[in-house]
C-alpha cells in the first residue's frame, strides 16, 4: 500500500507540472485545451487545475469562444505572473547587470551599474542593495523566489572553479546570498545562459540542438543538445576561446579569443591608433568610416570566428549557431562576412544568426534557469514570451 501511495503521489505531482507547463507555454488556454493536449480526462484536469489555482499559479481571463459544436464557453487562463519574482545578476568585468522578473519572465526592473576596477565585495554589495530595493517595491504573493548569478568563468556543482576576469577572493556567493535572503541561489556560466535564452525565448525554439557563441572579453560557447544544456564533466564544455587557430600566416598558435574577442579587437585597434581611450564605440565608428586598418582587423576576426564555428559544428553537428556579441550587434554587416567565410570552408548552409537582444539575453537566460529550478521543472521545456 505504501509503494502504491507513493506512486500515486508521484504521478499526481508529475501531472501537476504537465498542466503548469501547458499554462506557461500557452498564455491563453483552457481546461478543455489542456485536456486535449495531455490526453487526460476532464475530471483529472479539473482537479489538477483547481490545485494550481488554489496555490495562486493561475489567473483567469474570462470566457473564450465557444466550440463549433456549441456548448459552454471555456474559461481562459494564464500563468499568474505575480505568484512571485526572480532576480538575475550578470557579474561583468565592466558592468553589473541586474534584472528582476515576474514568474512569466516579464521584466520588472533592469539596471546597469559601472563596476570596472571595483572589487567583488563592492559588486556583491550592489547586488544586495538591488535585492533589498526589489523586496520593498515589488508586490508578489510569494515574494522573491530565487536568485541567479551569471559568471564569466567556469562553474561546477554551483561553485566558481575559474574566474579569469574578476578575482572572487574565494567568496562563497551561494552561501552568503542563501543565508541573507533565504531563497535558492544558482551560479551559471554566462555563455550557457545566453544559450538558454536562445532556447527558451528566441528562434532557438525551432531547434533541438544549437550552439551560442558568446563573444565579450573572452569567448565561450553555450551548448544545447536535445533541448538540454550540456555542461560537460566539470563544467568546462564550451571553453572554445582557448582553442588555437592556424588561420593565416600571422595567427598560428594563438588562441581564438586573443584575436577576435571584443577585448582583443579593441586592444589591437588601440595599439595601431596609439589611442588609449579606444573602446567599442571607437571601433564601430572607425569601421563605419571605412578605416582600412580597422576593416583589416575585423575582417581577420571574422575569418577566425568562421573557423571556430566550423570546428564546433564538425564536433557537435548543431541545427544552428547564434552569436551573442555587442560589437557585432553594432556592426551587423560583419555577420555576412562570417557566414561567407564559414560557407567557403564548410560548403553548407547552416543557419548562423546574431542574438536579437544582446542587452538582455544573458539576464533572461538566468531568469529562465532559476524559474525552472524554483518550480521543480528543470527537465521540462518552458517557453517564455519576450516583450517587444
Curated annotation (Swiss-Prot):
It comes from the Bacteria. InterPro entries: ATPase_NBD, ROK, ROK_cs, WH-like_DNA-bd_sf, WH_DNA-bd_sf. It comes from Lactiplantibacillus pentosus (Lactobacillus pentosus). The keyword Repressor applies. PANTHER family: BIFUNCTIONAL UDP-N-ACETYLGLUCOSAMINE 2-EPIMERASE_N-ACETYLMANNOSAMINE KINASE, ROK (REPRESSOR, ORF, KINASE) FAMILY. GO terms for biological process: D-xylose metabolic process. Residues 31-50 bind DNA. Belongs to the ROK (NagC/XylR) family. The lineage of its organism: Bacteria, Bacillati, Bacillota, Bacilli, Lactobacillales. The gene is xylR. One of its GO terms (molecular function) is DNA binding. This is Xylose repressor. Keywords: Carbohydrate metabolism, DNA-binding, Repressor, Transcription, Transcription regulation, Xylose metabolism.
